[in-house]
Amino acid sequence: MGVIQTLDSLMTNPMPEGRVEDILRPEGENPLLEKGYVTTSVDALLNWARTGSMWPMTFGLACCAVEMMHAGASRLDLDRYGVVFRPSPRQSDVMIVAGTLVNKMAPALRKVYDQMPDPKWVISMGSCANGGGYYHYSYSVVRGCDRIVPVDIYVPGCPPTAEALVYGILQLQKKIWRTQTIAR
């Protein structure tokens, strides 16, 4: 019985702590069902729409890319979170940098980042992307992709599990929800 409980805890998908406020709340008071309309701010509406439709572009450079592909497979099913991988930077709003970034690839990373439409976010996945990792002291390795592009979420590990990436994506959704889109 203890083994089954352990397996059940491994098979569950991670959820970020704290409540993510949603316009349509299934429990408690629901203003749409009670009054027939919802009042909200433009910021809240835009952020609500963005958290449900994140389109990441993969920038897989090493072994972390295999775990990124695993996260997109059927077991974890990122589609249910509104995450659909896109092949082009012009169609995506999230970049996942996974793996060792070398000096020769740094200009290409920046060029692809600049081609993404605003607003854009970056997830740094793995020890190599976060700070150079195992190859930190190599002459050709960039010691963290945050030296090239601004990073919003860091996913630690060597390589991080697919569940860790899903947790990082959920944390990014919470961060998007809290940002103010339109300056007052």
Curated annotation (Swiss-Prot):
Subcellular location: Cell inner membrane
Catalytic activity: a quinone + NADH + 5 H(+)(in) = a quinol + NAD(+) + 4 H(+)(out)
Coiled-coil ranges (or none): none
Cofactor note: Binds 1 [4Fe-4S] cluster.
A cellular component annotation (GO) from this entry: respiratory chain complex I
EC number(s) reported in the record: 7.1.1.-
Family: Belongs to the complex I 20 kDa subunit family.
HAMAP family reported for this sequence: NDH1_NuoB (MF_01356)
NCBIfam families: nuoB_fam, PRK06411.1
Function: NDH-1 shuttles electrons from NADH, via FMN and iron-sulfur (Fe-S) centers, to quinones in the respiratory chain. The immediate electron acceptor for the enzyme in this species is believed to be ubiquinone. Couples the redox reaction to proton translocation (for every two electrons transferred, four hydrogen ions are translocated across the cytoplasmic membrane), and thus conserves the redox energy in a proton gradient.
Protein name: NADH-quinone oxidoreductase subunit B
Lineage of origin: Bacteria, Pseudomonadati, Pseudomonadota, Gammaproteobacteria, Lysobacterales
